[in-house]
Amino acid sequence: MKKENRGKLKIIPLGGLEQIGMNITAFEYEDSIIVVDCGLAFPEDDMLGIDLVIPDVTYLKDNISKVKGFVITHGHEDHIGALPYVLKEINLPIYTTKLTMGIIENKLKEHNLLRTIKRKVVRHGQSINLGQFRIEFIKTNHSIQDASALAIYSPAGTVVHTGDFKVDYTPVFGDAGV
């Protein structure tokens, strides 16, 4: 049986490796890029005078015509904290769950970005299509409600991005009530 070449999926970490915080990963397939999370990091002790560390998004700016939007796993600062700063440079839509979107909207309001950024609330079990990608939001347990893992489908295959999660034998699930 001949194996079909379905192209290559690039997974490009722009932060969050070998450090705590600043989680941001680009997934690229041909003419489409999606960005999962956009967090900040807090400065190390030797970084005097620095309040926040935000990711270098030069790759996204250089490929802006391919970038379809931000897909956010949950509302912790290391996953959403850099959004207002990055969105001032690259205006892209945000896709996430209801509680997480509420937290993000408060940040956008603080930075006078609420009216300029497109946003879409996605439910667990629902999928969205962005360019060459289909992204399914999967309910996961974490220390914040409404957290998601993501099944990212592309012509090259499927990647499951877990975001953050915790094993909890007595999880609190249900509607976030936002």
Feature annotation, model-predicted:
Residues 2-71, 76-178:
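His/Asp/Glu-rich metal-coordinating catalytic cores
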